[in-house]
Amino acid sequence: MSIEINNISKYFGRTKVLNDITLDIPSGQMVALLGPSGSGKTTLLRIIAGLENQNAGRLSFHGTDVSRLHARDRRVGFVFQHYALFRHMTVFDNIAFGLTVLPRRERPNAAAIKQKVGQLLEMVQLGHLAERFPSQLSGGQKQRVALARALAVEPQILLLDEPFGALDAQVRKELRRWLRQLHEELKFTSVFVTHDQEEAMEVADRVVVVSQGNIEQVGTPDEVWREPATRFVLEFLGEVNRLSGEIRGSQLFIGAHHWPLDLAPMHQGSVDLFLRPWEMEVSTQSSDRCPLPVQVLEVSPRGHFWQLTVQPIGWHQDPISVVLPEGNIDAPVRGNRYYVGGLNARLYSGNQLLQPIALAQSA
């Protein structure tokens, strides 16, 4: 079941929280709405579910306008962050609840409900806990029950609002893998909200990055990671170093160092230069490739690489992060002096992207 969102806007009072959102979600895809708190991602999810109404725009499922359709008639399953299980019901009864309240003409008989719930319990690997109550379950088990309950009515679309946000890190990882496997088996269309970048990258087929009610970028996890479309996406996804520079003519200056640009840009003056830690080279000797001196402040071993916090010497005020692959040089220690450069620097004037530059040859 595909989802088509066309020019949707939403106000709360005089505050506009969604700005003319347009997005197509193909049938069978798992899509992450990723953004910081207050970005509008949960509001968009609730509009898809029918729990909120848009002020403008059209929402369609597989080409059929559902904008005025009540939530109960949309055949959408919804999983909340805090489970929303009925405390007085067993696991079995929680999962069966949606089936028991269907209109009489659509409601399965007791035997069919029992069979369906049994299948769902096995699917979420909780068959041995059918008679327990929510208070007797772990957080991960509760979330599996909530997911089984949402799937019981065979929804056309599954929506999840930060489904793993209340769980500890290890349980989150396990449930992410499990949900992805379940999606591969059932091929349902799914949209989930998260502010966890790792979660979005690991689980989703496509990632929709949202900020201040706007869609900043839509793409595969690899696309939004490697080719950020806007300055917001670049700064929001992962760790990035921001350096201050200045363009004079066709030269970029950082402290006492300067590099030639291919063309003299229209913009002259102050710019921001962005480099991700793993896009920087590190050397024990100054060279054309690594001309910028730094001193190591912190060393964090990460298995096959070292994460370094270094203080630029004479060319930038604040510490920056650098990734040093294991084996390139001797194990780093605090106080070591190195030289760094970069091969994929991105230049911005405000929110405008200027030409990329390699900090590999200092003029």
From Swiss-Prot:
UniProt xrefs under SMART domains: AAA
GO cellular component: ATP-binding cassette (ABC) transporter complex
Alphabetized UniProt keyword annotations: ATP-binding, Cell inner membrane, Cell membrane, Membrane, Nucleotide-binding, Sulfate transport, Translocase, Transport
Pfam annotation, one family: ABC_tran
Compartments, as annotated in UniProt: Cell inner membrane
Keyword match Cell inner membrane: yes
GO annotation, biological process: sulfate transmembrane transport
Membrane topology listed for this record: Peripheral membrane protein
Lipoprotein recorded as keyword: no
Domain ABC transporter as annotated: residue spans: 3-237
Reaction(s) catalysed by this chain's protein: sulfate(out) + ATP + H2O = sulfate(in) + ADP + phosphate + H(+); thiosulfate(out) + ATP + H2O = thiosulfate(in) + ADP + phosphate + H(+)
GO molecular function: ABC-type sulfate transporter activity; ABC-type thiosulfate transporter activity; ATP binding; ATP hydrolysis activity
Subunit structure: The complex is composed of two ATP-binding proteins (CysA), two transmembrane proteins (CysT and CysW) and a solute-binding protein (CysP).
PANTHER family listed in its UniProt record: SPERMIDINE/PUTRESCINE IMPORT ATP-BINDING PROTEIN POTA, SPERMIDINE_PUTRESCINE IMPORT ATP-BINDING PROTEIN POTA
Family, as annotated: Belongs to the ABC transporter superfamily. Sulfate/tungstate importer (TC 3.A.1.6) family.
Record-given protein name: Sulfate/thiosulfate import ATP-binding protein CysA
Organism lineage: Bacteria, Pseudomonadati, Pseudomonadota, Gammaproteobacteria, Enterobacterales
